[in-house]
């Protein structure tokens, strides 16, 4: 049954927020606050043509309670029965005091239910969502931005919301994804890739309001889960690779009106503007997005988050200075957005080593005194541990001299945290012999080694260190758990004739980066002592670690693996104590919750574009009383799915979604298919991607047979497309790639 409803839109105009960048007016400390006049002028219109905007499908009556306007106490308590925020509570610690599942009995954990969502299986989508659970109902979002309400006890679908994203949307940098939703005040809050913030009716999935946060045509998108707190919905924006001006903003949860917006790039005359060239317009195009869910300390009245890289990512030649507030942990007044403090992890970033991992708040006794801490795991491979009251390091961080490049305008020093790095930070001669091709003869370096016209291969890479997959803190072990990536990336600056200029809505990278051909990618699962920043134990994987971590009172951590496994480790010593193989890459963080005294573990296993993993659409939920030891044990009829899709349709759905309506072998058709399946890794027009080589320079670019073979079967971290694209589509992509050859005009 389809239910079409009228949409209630809240449109807003805020001076200096939505105008053309040329008209942006400097605001004190980059902060803009709504006044009464702004609120009075907010336009409200109904009767939007929702035939072009969204669809809701109701499968059964809503069985649970309606979420209240949660108090600060409710949102700060460690999650037990419910999982109320993306990070479990306002502190983002992903720790649960539920302890019925322990190291002693976790081997008995079995599959309780599986639900197929029927969405987000095309390769361009990534399943990175953390489910929310409130009073027996789970809320999850797919990479296609479709939201489902699910009976958390049985897995039965309650409703689905299916937005129609903006036609022509092509400014998504790093895979189409969403990392979750928020719940509060009877609403489910959703950030969409076309930069809309939407409030859904918790019982029906119908739209109550939506706000166009910014213009996707300029590169603004929303990939993070919003945060509900104190009657407000907080969200940042992604898009640093497109030269946006990053910010964090708060919206009225009842109507969607903007309350405040604080920019992460200071306008001329604002605090921090001295870290940009005086004649630079970098404050309008310099990036510093906020693409992870923030944390809040209600006692201090402070909201915390990390900011992204500068733009252009890899070219510092025209932005001399530290480029605040990029690559920083920031603290703002949660009510007003006013600046409190910042700590910059990378000065003048030219490596795309921005702090992508969500910040985690914790309280711990140090030197006989309880301290309010904040930890952020960086792409650098270090964890930065600060006092969240002042922003000063709780454990020492030293400014040390680093190699210099006059052309890149590098910073003379960089912060070096005291403690252990959780991934290697240099490429050694032994690494070259062990891991790299025999014909490799390039320059090698370490973290903070600059580059210019000649390629330099370094560690860590733009994948990390720690990337977006959330870390966790367990107050019982006093350990911080983090996933790390260890791979080889080469950087080189464009030649003068290829010098990249800013063009609105186009990628603004500034140089070339790519993984070293035929080199291994590895991952780490690491436990660090929060008081010393020293490694307690570490597990090494033969693939990148790209999911997230849950830790519990049962002395366990749970995480997902690229091969589809969800794995449990002993939180104290790292011993593997349980695993279960799903049917797709387990590339999202697990959660836990309790209903009627039974503890559940749940994960969205749907694959990931940048990890190159198999795609799917299922949520897997486990308990000690579960019935199934493997996916093969569960009868197909017992897998929950949208009623209109039978199992045969579900098996075909991934293929159907991935196939172009146009078909054929034309270059234009190939370009469309490329955008949907290849752009995130290889970049626009085959260059500037996040996990793939520059195709324009590839030796096979003019060899159609070799291209078709590569697309069909994949290699290294590239997955095969023979099962998701037709012969005609593969041929079309090959023809498009051949058109990119530098030998053609």
Regions found by a protein language model. Give the residues of each.
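Bacterial signal peptide processing site
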Residues: 17-20
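Blade/loop signatures of beta-propeller domains
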Residues: 47-112, 264-271, 432-451, 515, ...
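Repeat-blade elements of multi-bladed beta-propeller folds
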Residues: 83-87, 125-146, 171-196, 221-245, ...
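Electrostatic cytochrome c docking/interface patches
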Residues: 642-673
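Extracytoplasmic beta-rich repeat domains
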Residues: 115-130, 160-182, 210-225, 242, ...
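C-terminal capping alpha-helices of c-type cytochrome domains
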Residues: 191, 711, 722-745
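Blade-level signature of beta-propeller repeat domains, shared across WD40, Kelch, NHL, RCC1
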Residues: 591-641
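Gly/Gly-Pro-rich "capping" loops immediately C-terminal to redox-active cysteine motifs
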Residues: 671, 680-717, 721-724
